[in-house]
From Swiss-Prot:
<comment type="subunit">
    <text>Part of the 30S ribosomal subunit. Forms a tight heterodimer with protein bS6.</text>
</comment>
<dbReference type="GO" id="GO:0003735">
    <property type="term" value="F:structural constituent of ribosome"/>
</dbReference>
<dbReference type="GO" id="GO:0006412">
    <property type="term" value="P:translation"/>
</dbReference>
<keyword id="KW-0699">rRNA-binding</keyword>
<dbReference type="Pfam" id="PF01084">
    <property type="entry name" value="Ribosomal_S18"/>
</dbReference>
<keyword id="KW-0689">Ribosomal protein</keyword>
<dbReference type="InterPro" id="IPR018275">
    <property type="entry name" value="Ribosomal_bS18_CS"/>
</dbReference>
<dbReference type="GO" id="GO:0070181">
    <property type="term" value="F:small ribosomal subunit rRNA binding"/>
</dbReference>
<protein>
    <recommendedName>
        <fullName>Small ribosomal subunit protein bS18</fullName>
    </recommendedName>
</protein>
<comment type="function">
    <text>Binds as a heterodimer with protein bS6 to the central domain of the 16S rRNA, where it helps stabilize the platform of the 30S subunit.</text>
</comment>
<keyword id="KW-0687">Ribonucleoprotein</keyword>
<dbReference type="InterPro" id="IPR001648">
    <property type="entry name" value="Ribosomal_bS18"/>
</dbReference>
<dbReference type="InterPro" id="IPR036870">
    <property type="entry name" value="Ribosomal_bS18_sf"/>
</dbReference>
<keyword id="KW-0694">RNA-binding</keyword>
<comment type="similarity">
    <text>Belongs to the bacterial ribosomal protein bS18 family.</text>
</comment>
<dbReference type="GO" id="GO:0022627">
    <property type="term" value="C:cytosolic small ribosomal subunit"/>
</dbReference>
């Protein structure tokens, strides 16, 4: 069954790879974004709606932490404070 195939012959899909890993020249290393709240010692607050506007999109959605660079702890707190500000009518739920 496998006698026709040479044991030392590699599969054609692995010809351009070295040791199973392909070198990708298009890959760029990105600097990890630091959390604005951890660096400054400031905590998100619903009353500071001008600062909270930086963390929502034009449509009014909360930006994810991979874009804002906040830590998981502060992202959860930020989402809570944005929701409080929306409830208090300091921030809109949806922008037109």
């Amino acid at each position: 069954m496998y006698k026709d195939r040479d044991v030392n012959q590699r599969d054609s899909r692995f010809e351009n790879q070295q040791d199973g890993f392909k070198k990708n020249s298009n890959f760029r290393f990105f600097k990890r974004k630091s959390c604005k709240f951890c660096d400054s010692g400031k905590h998100p607050d619903y009353k500071d709606f001008d600062f909270l506007k930086k963390f929502i999109t034009e449509q009014g959605k909360i930006l994810p932490k991979r874009i804002t660079g906040t830590s998981a702890k502060h992202q959860r707190r930020l989402a809570l404070e944005v929701k409080r500000a929306r409830y208090m009518a300091l921030l809109p739920f949806v922008k037109k």
